[in-house]
Amino acid sequence: MTYKEIIKNKEINAYLKKGNENLGQLGYTDHSQKHCMQVAHQAGKILKKLGYSEHEIELAQIAGYMHDIGNVINRSHHAEYGALLANELLKETDMTLEDRVTIVPRFCSYCSCKTGRRNDQRGGCMPGDFICT
């Protein structure tokens, strides 16, 4: 599953669209597909500059695009809801288990990690965690 395929996925886009509508009713600013594409683009740009592999960059772009998917359920804890939704949606694709378990935990950590330093230690920031803050 590639980033280009993810941004064309009808189910993912339906969740993002409805989540943005829900947030709009609550007075939040734009969390549309456009916002998600900007996050994905910035994630890719920053990770490329930091010397990450093309594969890691693509995973960060996928996570960046999907990072607000949990807003379809609730703004509060949207990262956790997003991780659960993303895992189920990505199971239905050809994405490997290894890639899925790399992406899904990022949904729960991006809100708290703001350093941008590479730290692959358990519990630390991973590539792209700081992008979505």
Predicted regions and their residues:
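Divalent metal-dependent catalytic cores for phosphoryl transfer on phosphate-bearing substrates
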Residues: 50-133
